């Protein structure tokens, strides 16, 4: 595994060869729900305009690109780790597990895997961790969009089950509204019990 910071266009050209997969995660910081990862192999002959780090795109734009990625990519796979797995393994190791699941779910074995961030798990093929890769490499951008839309939809579904928590707004992140809901309504089965605010709410 190589960690690449400040990647140059020349380096991008060197590593973006063959049927490589981009991988990213969403949901390391929230107090509830799965950490969600995605792996995407794009089709160089069927480009998608407007790919970028999902955090820099509007919800409407993410949803539009989500559909285009599903239609145009060679392969798309989502992998998750549950709150129970997060509590057992810790969030870092659970995220690595979710990434392995996403790559294993691809219907094409990638020639290499490019991950946003500063570390990768063992995928059984060459891998590179690329800092800020979600804004630099289209396949990672696509993975960030898929993971973000999938996780947001999971939070919207949770909001229908527990409307008093406001998950459709804060998506489970540690906001003032979420802390107030925890204090008033208590901890849900889907909360991550190893995260301090949840642990304190249980005390």
From Swiss-Prot:
Cofactor binding note from Swiss-Prot or TrEMBL: Manganese or magnesium. Binds 1 divalent metal ion per monomer in the absence of substrate. May bind a second metal ion after substrate binding.
Key words, A-Z: Cytoplasm, Endonuclease, Hydrolase, Manganese, Metal-binding, Nuclease
EC number: 3.1.26.4
Record GO biological process: DNA replication, removal of RNA primer; mismatch repair
Positions bound to a divalent metal cation: 24-25, 116
One GO cellular component term noted in the UniProt record for this chain: ribonuclease H2 complex
Keyword hit for Metal-binding: yes
Gene Ontology MF, one: RNA-DNA hybrid ribonuclease activity
Disulfide bonds: none
TM ranges: none
Residue ranges constituting the RNase H type-2 domain according to the UniProt record: 18-203
Swiss-Prot/TrEMBL catalytic activity: Endonucleolytic cleavage to 5'-phosphomonoester
CDD domains assigned to the protein according to its UniProt record, in alphabetical order: RNase_HII_bacteria_HII_like (cd07182)
Family of the protein in this entry: Belongs to the RNase HII family.
Protein name per Swiss-Prot or TrEMBL: Ribonuclease HII
Species of origin: Shewanella pealeana (strain ATCC 700345 / ANG-SQ1)
Gene encoding the protein: rnhB
């Amino acid at each position: 595994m190589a960690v690449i910071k400040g990647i140059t266009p020349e380096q991008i050209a060197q590593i973006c060869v063959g049927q490589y997969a981009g991988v990213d995660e969403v949901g390391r910081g929230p107090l509830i729900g799965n950490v969600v990862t995605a792996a995407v192999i794009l089709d160089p002959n069927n480009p998608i305009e407007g790919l970028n780090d999902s955090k820099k795109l509007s919800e409407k734009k993410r949803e539009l690109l989500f559909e285009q990625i599903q239609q145009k990519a060679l392969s798309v796979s989502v992998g998750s780790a549950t709150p129970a797995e997060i509590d057992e393994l810790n969030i870092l190791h659970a995220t690595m597990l979710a990434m392995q699941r996403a790559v294993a779910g691809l219907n094409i074995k990638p020639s290499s895997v490019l991950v946003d961030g500063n570390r990768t798990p063992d995928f059984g093929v060459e891998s590179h961790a690329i800092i800020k890769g979600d804004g630099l490499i289209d396949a990672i951008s696509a993975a960030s969009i898929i993971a973000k839309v999938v996780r947001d939809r999971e939070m919207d579904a949770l909001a229908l089950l527990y409307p008093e928590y406001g998950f459709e707004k804060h998506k489970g992140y540690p906001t003032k509204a979420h802390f107030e809901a925890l204090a008033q309504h208590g901890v849900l089965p889907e909360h991550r019990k190893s995260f301090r605010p949840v642990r304190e709410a249980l005390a």
